[in-house]
């Protein structure tokens, strides 16, 4: 599923991401835009053999199990396929675990490079939330 901007913002808000660990909703919508272009089915293979999955491009080396990543830790205790669902609950729950680690949203390269320090509120402007 490819979410609309405001549709995704509403879903993320409903699932408790607004101001989760101090990151406003705009940060999450911005991250999803530049990680997956709002597409829940996005997958990207990395040079280390791991794969990033779903709307927030969650990595199989650490967070989920895809059965093909050597030394996978599966810290969210989920199959990576769960991160490709049109229902973003699994992705959001895993993202909460990731952002609670030491580096916060810096764990997402696209957020660090494209969203951090920008006017992220623009991503939810005009949405009925």
UniProtKB/Swiss-Prot annotation:
PROSITE patterns: GLYCOSYL_HYDROL_F22_1, GLYCOSYL_HYDROL_F22_2
GO biological process: defense response to Gram-negative bacterium; defense response to Gram-positive bacterium; killing of cells of another organism
Location of the protein in the cell: Secreted
Chief site of localization: secreted
Keyword field contains Nucleotide-binding: no
Keywords associated with the record: Antimicrobial, Bacteriolytic enzyme, Disulfide bond, Glycosidase, Hydrolase, Secreted
GO molecular function, one term: lysozyme activity
Cystine pairings recorded for this chain: 6-127, 30-115, 64-80, 76-94
A Pfam entry, by short name: Lys
Gene Ontology CC, one term: extracellular region
InterPro entries (UniProt xref): Glyco_hydro_22, Glyco_hydro_22_CS, Glyco_hydro_22_lys, Lysozyme-like_dom_sf
Known catalytic reactions: Hydrolysis of (1->4)-beta-linkages between N-acetylmuramic acid and N-acetyl-D-glucosamine residues in a peptidoglycan and between N-acetyl-D-glucosamine residues in chitodextrins
EC number of this enzyme: 3.2.1.17
Chain ranges of the C-type lysozyme domain: 1-129
Lineage top rank: taxon: Eukaryota
Residues at the catalytic site: 35, 52
Note, other: Lysozyme C is capable of both hydrolysis and transglycosylation; it also shows a slight esterase activity. It acts rapidly on both peptide-substituted and unsubstituted peptidoglycan, and slowly on chitin oligosaccharides.
Annotated function: Lysozymes have primarily a bacteriolytic function; those in tissues and body fluids are associated with the monocyte-macrophage system and enhance the activity of immunoagents.
Subunit relationships: Monomer.
Family classification: Belongs to the glycosyl hydrolase 22 family.
Official protein name in the record: Lysozyme C
Organism: Tragopan satyra
């Amino acid at each position: 599923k490819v979410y609309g901007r405001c549709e995704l913002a509403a879903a993320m808000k409903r699932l408790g991401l607004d101001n989760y660990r101090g990151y406003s909703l705009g940060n999450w919508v911005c991250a999803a835009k530049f990680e997956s272009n709002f597409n829940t089915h996005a997958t990207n293979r990395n040079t280390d053999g791991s794969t990033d999955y779903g709307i927030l491009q969650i990595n199989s080396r650490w967070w989920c199990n895809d059965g093909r990543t050597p030394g996978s830790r599966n810290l969210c205790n989920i199959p990576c396929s769960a991160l490709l669902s049109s229902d973003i609950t699994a992705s959001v729950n895993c993202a909460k675990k990731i952002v609670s680690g030491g580096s916060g949203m810096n764990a997402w390269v696209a957020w660090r490079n494209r969203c951090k320090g920008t006017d992220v509120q623009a991503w939810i402007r005009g949405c009925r939330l």
